[in-house]
From Swiss-Prot:
The lineage of its organism: Bacteria, Bacillati, Bacillota, Clostridia, Eubacteriales. InterPro entries: GHMP_kinase_C_dom, GHMP_kinase_C_sf, GHMP_kinase_N_dom, GHMP_knse_ATP-bd_CS, Homoserine_kinase, Ribosomal_Su5_D2-typ_SF, Ribsml_uS5_D2-typ_fold_subgr. One of its GO terms (molecular function) is homoserine kinase activity. Belongs to the GHMP kinase family. Homoserine kinase subfamily. Coiled coil: none annotated. GO terms for cellular component: cytoplasm. Its main location: cytoplasm. This is Homoserine kinase. Pathway: Amino-acid biosynthesis; L-threonine biosynthesis; L-threonine from L-aspartate: step 4/5. It comes from the Bacteria. It comes from Clostridium botulinum (strain Langeland / NCTC 10281 / Type F). ATP binds at residues 82-92.
Length: 297
């Protein structure tokens, strides 16, 4: 049996639209083995127990590339990553499927080939890359090839995810974005993306609040998330380092100093006054990325 563990990811980190992403310590686990016939799913809802299951779709893509034909499959899922909340649940399924398929087929593809294949299936590298590699990454796609660099994050910072009880599909969140942008808005984001990477690298945490600002996606998507601005304002009052929409949302991600012991309790009290229910989870950066049979990919 092959066991694969994939971390949740938070993409964009404010201005780094479709390029920055970070892995955090929430995980999905996949247990896959070859059986005599059929496809057996365990640990997921009945509506996902078919060949359209994203994990199976990713596995088949890998098998087809390698030229491997399993007799049958048993796929067991232990999922802790919330679905459609902007925490990379689909990327985790794609990565888990491709990596487990490759392992079953004898490891025919190397890490680079697996990464390129996963981005081909998922569509964007910002979640897939940190899910594979761990840590924070800056990624681009160049002629279907994934190019990336690890972003060093200085010690002394942690994350806090504010996860609502409602979902937001990536398709809906994409649909509200404009077809084109002003030149000055592009410059605005380029500067703040560079500042974000530099501030995290050098430990200039006081600059993060400036670097989190964005003009390409967050304001458009905030309209789909009730109380986004009031929550953001409250986080800032509670001395957060920075606040941004995690991926396409609706999860709101907060950056904090490691020694901040009061934020989670205080923001939870505020969130309890709102209509929707919000879960508060303090998180650390996952530095390992995808783990296969207890070894780093």
């Amino acid at each position: 049996m092959v066991e694969v563990r994939v971390p949740a990811t938070s993409a964009n980190i404010g201005p780094g639209f479709d390029c920055l992403g970070v892995a955090v310590n929430i995980y999905n686990k996949f247990f896959v083995e070859e059986v005599e016939e059929g496809i057996i799913f365990e640990g997921c809802a009945d509506k996902f127990k078919n060949e359209n299951n994203l994990i199976y779709v990713a596995m088949k893509k890998c098998f087809d590339k390698i030229g491997y034909k399993p007799t049958g499959l048993r796929i067991k899922i232990e999922s802790d990553i919330p679905v459609s909340r902007g925490l990379g649940s689909s990327a985790a399924c794609v990565v888990g499927g491709i990596v487990s398929a490759n392992e079953l087929a004898g490891g025919a593809l190397n890490k680079k080939e697996l990464l390129d294949l996963a981005v081909e299936v998922e569509g964007h590298p910002d979640n897939v890359n940190p899910a594979f590699c761990g840590g924070m990454t800056a990624s681009i796609s160049d002629n279907r090839e994934v190019i990336y660099s690890k972003v060093k994050v200085s010690e002394g910072i942690k994350f806090c995810a504010l996860i609502p009880d409602f979902t937001l599909s990536t398709e809906k969140a994409r649909a509200v974005l404009p077809k084109s942008i002003d030149y000055k808005d592009g410059i605005f984001n380029v500067g703040r993306t560079a500042l974000m990477i530099s501030a995290l690298n050098n430990g200039d945490f006081h600059l993060i609040k400036y670097a989190c600002k964005d003009k390409l996606h967050q304001d458009y998507r905030a309209k789909l998330i009730e109380n986004f601005y009031s929550i953001k304002k409250q986080c800032e009052k509670l001395n957060s380092l920075g606040v941004f929409l995690s991926g396409a949302g609706p999860t709101i991600m907060v950056m904090l100093r490691e020694e901040d012991k009061d934020f989670s309790k205080n923001i939870k009290s505020f969130l309890e006054t709102l209509k929707n229910k919000w879960e508060v989870r303090e998180l650390k950066i996952d530095k390992l990325g995808t783990v296969v049979n207890n070894r780093k990919l």
